Amino acid sequence: MPGSDLSAWIAGPLPSVTSSLGDWLQGPAELQAEREAEDAWSTSDSVSGTWRPRGEASRSRSPQPSPVGPREGVSEEPSPTTSSDSRPAFRRELHGLRAVALGLVAVYHIWLGRVSGGVDVFLFLSAFFLTGTFVRRLENGRPLGVPRYWLHTFKRLLPPSAVTILLVLAATATFLPASMWQTIMQEAVASAAYLQNLLLVVLQVDYHARDAGAASPLQHFWSLSVQGQAFVVWPLLFLLVARRARAGKPVRRPLIAIIALIGAASLTWSIISTQSQQEIAYFDTAARMWEFAAGSLLALALPVLDRLTGARRPEEGQAPRHRTLRALTGWAGVAALLACGVLLDVSSMFPGWIAIWPLAAAGAVVVAGYSGRRWGVDAVLSTRPAAFIGDISYALYLVHWPILVIWLHHSGQERAGLLDGLVVLTGSLLLAWLVTRAVDAPVRRSRWLEAKPWRALTAIALSFALVAGAAGGWWMFLHRDQPQPPVAEGPSLATDEVATEAPPDVQPYGWQLGQQWPTLPESCSGPWEPERGFPHVNCQQLLPGDATATETIVVVGSSHSRQFIPAVLPTATSRDAQVVNLSMDGCPFLAGTERWPYCAGYDEYVLEYLDAVEPDSVLTTVTQAFDDGTEEILPEGTDGALQTLLDRGIGVIAVRDTPRWGQDQYQCAEAVIDRGGTPVEADAACGADVEDKLAPENPAAPLTALSTPDATVTLLDLTPQICPDGRCAPVLGDTFVYMDDNHLTRLFVEESLAPAVTRELESMAG
């Protein structure tokens, strides 16, 4: 390549027209404005070969600056009769800042397993560009065109996302264990609907878990979901000042007041939520909106800052004031951004106030702008290599995480090493370039798609339908002709021993894990219907509401009580007994004790219900095991809670807790079995001796002394069945014992525990 060509290649691209909208809704001027609008994922189109050398670009542009400074996101919009070349200047250094932010995200994900602050920069830039787009429309007296903005934005963003999700579904079926399939199907649909962050909260995902190989390959869509939700809500704020703009009044000050108020409220909530429930706050859109507000406030204030500091753009042919200070400020911003993840304990502090650090760093680069110095950070960020990464940044964000997760799962590592990490990064760059060329760029530039609103809407709907259809079709294929698991059907191999040879089939299958949570067939009705509802409690019953029951058993407490429901069903069915599930996941029954906010009021709700239905007995778990080696205990207040039941004449079936683990027992054993290993090998890799998981003696033994002539406490200790011969194995016979790191599979409870429980309940009746 000749030297001049190399110099031009390094110098960096200027944007060309990336798409064209038809004349609909608001007319040609708004059509051009929408075309020129930029967001955090915009490209310079250099990937498609339409880059123009700097000299040619600057000769073709109008040198006239905006009265408030020609900065992307804040400068004046062209009039209907103005040449497209006079549009607001493309901020090449901000395009390069995208490359830095995305590079940080990828590097930290692949090698460090830490939060870098790069995602926060994308949220910040999204708001910066979005605000500039709508403020220019307001100040030029043009309609906001919010519906068209939504169509234009999601028409560009969703097709590459859909392609990535479809590739992930295919890779999941090929490379990942069946235990991950159902979750990934759910996340695929949630990601395409921009609801992934909410689903991750429901699934109680820990973003900062050290083992990325155990994470979902779609987990990273949480940030795109937050961004998508903001793209829907944020434009509506500008409608609040639309009438003022039509009257010719200034809109920036009212907008600053509105957005500052929202930002302050969001930041306050973010700080509180991060301190109390950081694993939820990390995915919470409300806890992230202040980052969007920060970008908007900078966009609104930048014209004044530009005017006061004498900012210029390269296209003006004039040097800015304070050139050295601008160059140093830009470098300080990049340095602060690079250092963020290294110097801060972001794993426990984000997204609280500490996220101001990466936003301030990005803001420094924005404010510094064009420095006029060859060594300025803007010059480096404006080079062609930086622009190339910026151009593929959206696709690179989409594909790098799935490639990393699939590789780590295949290799059995928690983090990639230097060499395999480089392979992951290189593969991500190549696939991102391909997705950009084959999907992203054609969709962005398609005049046909932009010509009519229904076409853009069709592209959005089709993208979502492909994902939902693929995930739903896969789910239906797996569950075709699959009956509900039978109650207490005998296993093909004895479940009181660990098989030394690989059984032909170990069940339940991974994609059936969602069916392993015990349920009852009827919603509570008739005399068993609660007088009022309670959050997170779904009252269920065995017999229909109009049935006549000989006795009633109510299951209360946490999911560790709920998991034993299948064990009592054979006895209940034979006796025509009513079984009611009033459990609440995460909340053991401890009436009379102070509870954490999530469980507050649950015990009172249970007692209110019991007073209404007057059951014969209550089944609840009374001890608590731990996954860190801490000895099993009888929680404080358990005896008092049981006494409240006995005083009401209600018998108690007090169940001993099951072992809890530091790793997912199903996935651990599944990995061994999938490689052709035996249950004995799975036990060696995943199991433990019972003395390492439970106390030597049942801590609940003293509770039997609470029994009265009218109501007794019956201890139910199923440890011999769960951990036969003193060993807690993940596979007994041809059945997986655990569905995760602390819950038994429904199939194991039915096959192995139900007979023992039946014998115990029959002895109670005798």
Which positions does each model-derived feature cover?
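Actinobacteria-biased recognition of intrinsically disordered, low-complexity terminal regions
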Residues: 1-88, 311-314, 765-766
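Membrane-interface helix/loop caps of multi-pass membrane proteins
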Residues: 3, 23, 52, 74-453, ...
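Selective for proline/serine-rich intrinsically disordered segments
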Residues: 11-13, 26, 51, 61-68, ...
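Poly-acidic low-complexity segments
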Residues: 20, 50, 91-92, 145, ...
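Extracellular/periplasmic envelope-modification machinery, especially enzymes
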Residues: 57, 318, 346, 409-422, ...
